[in-house]
From Swiss-Prot:
GO terms for biological process: cellular response to nicotine; chemical synaptic transmission; monoatomic ion transmembrane transport; regulation of membrane potential. The chain crosses the membrane at residues 324-344, 357-377, 392-412, 564-584. PANTHER family: NEUROTRANSMITTER GATED ION CHANNEL. It comes from Caenorhabditis elegans. Keywords: Cell membrane, Glycoprotein, Ion channel, Ion transport, Ligand-gated ion channel, Membrane, Postsynaptic cell membrane, Receptor, Signal, Synapse, Transmembrane, Transmembrane helix, Transport. This is Acetylcholine receptor subunit alpha-type acr-5. The lineage of its organism: Eukaryota, Metazoa, Ecdysozoa, Nematoda, Chromadorea.
Amino acid sequence: MLPNIILILLIRYCSCGAGSRVYEKYGKQVQLSPATTSSYREWYDSNREHSTRNNTNVDDFQTQLKKSLENTTAAYNATFMQELIEERQRYLEKLNEGQFINDQRRLVEELLDPNYYEKTVHPKRDYTRPTRVNLSMSLYQILDVDEHMQSIEVNVWMVQHWYDEFLDWNPVDYGMINRTIVPYHQIWIPDTYLYNSEELEQKKTESLMNAQLETGHWNQKKDGAKVQLMFPAIYKLSCRMDVRWFPYDRQNCTFIISSWTHDKQTIDYWPLSSTVNLGNMARNDEWEVISFEFVRVEETFKCCTAPWVMLYAHLVIRRKPLYYMINLVVPTSIITIVAVTGFFTPTSSSSERDEKLYLGINTLLTMSVMMLMVCNQMPSTSTYVPLMSWYYIGIIMVIVVGTFLATGVLAIHGQKHYNKPISDRIRKLIYNPVVEFFILSPPTSLIDLWTEFGVISEQRHSTHLDPLLLQHMDPISHTTRADPQHFFGSISSQMCDLQSTYSYTARLATITRQYTQHAKMKALRKNQYRMSMDTSQARGVKKQKMQRRCSLEWEFLANVLDRILLTIFCGFTFAVFIILIGFDSFFTFHTDSPPKTM
């Protein structure tokens, strides 16, 4: 046997290459011959490779080792075999007691040994050097956006990684293990906190699990092991809602992420990427994500001299307006148009016009209920009025003004009972070709009355001549017809002569009849009395026609006003509806965000 030849006992071989610390902890020095050492090493290496390929467990390997030792006992001298058997018995006892485990468990136990590692200590051997924490985030789902409470709730996946110089190891000493998993509460982790979270207890929002360690032995920088902490979180954070353009609003909800106790001299936060991962996000039917970007800002507070590194994650979302268009805007516009049409539909009776007032009151009640539904979703702020509220205010004003104007038209319609004709100016306004073509034509009965009473201009009358005058008129020559001046002059002169002759003949005949019919004076008086009776009947008929004319004039004026107001209000309502439907296409606006500094 050669001196100073040290062989790690069977425990080192069974642990598959443990480091010096394990040897110091469990090992023992023995002196073996070169032949013995070489033979046992060859046997161990061959059986170790065989057991590794065949995934042999510890019990099978123990049985093989026991059988091999029994077979080789006779080949060695009694002294060495006695020592080997004793060492084998001690190994079997410790193996049965569970003191020898696989490489991964041994690695974890040694890394987290309280005598070697302290989780409250900064993970840098030089404490003056800050620990760089790289942070990334993936948005999984937008759970809720509460405009009234001005908060948003999201489901995100957080990833933080940094380097810990006290957790590094050599993979050669641990079966080439480059990565392992350890409980998060047994290592140092940064106190990353969401500043604007509505939940103060972090355990209720973050589900921390295990941390992943990756050796830094192969890294040339020698920064230590890479620690990666991945966990899901449900954050409910306060978000100032800007709903002035509701339902076309865009919201910018900012995540303020930083350490609560460490400034830049201890922890330096950096975003792993400038944008948040949206690849795994579940679709939201109400909101559309426009952007989700990280911004790194160094801020100085009054409490501390050193700056604090803050990570701002700006989540910009846009509301999908289809739901509100279908359930609020379209029904409101239809109700308004129906109400306006009912207000200003021409009617002839007063009872029908009275129903318009009840229609206006019912429509106002409907608008108030629908506006209340919108107000329940809006934040209680006096800074601005949402676009949807302006829409309902405008619609309510249309209904109110329409109701008042319908009352005015009703009052105009009631003037027909006073038998007072309308003024000539108003008559000229409502009876002209423009109004007749674009708005409303007067009824035929009213035109006949206007013609009978001479209201319509003389150009609309036909000139009728007495047949006796036409019989005594001389024919007009073709030469006179060719010259318009002589034509009208000839007619005028003949008319004057004939009228003079006709008047003289008529007066002479009247005097002759008076003298010749003196005997019939009594009958004549009877005839005069009968004619006076006919005249009073004619006056009554004329009065009735005058009343009819006044009634038709006021009704026609009310109908013209109804038609004009109907066109104006329907056009206004339709224009507001089109503007609101296409508001997002007609107008563009931007959501404010803090300055981007890195």
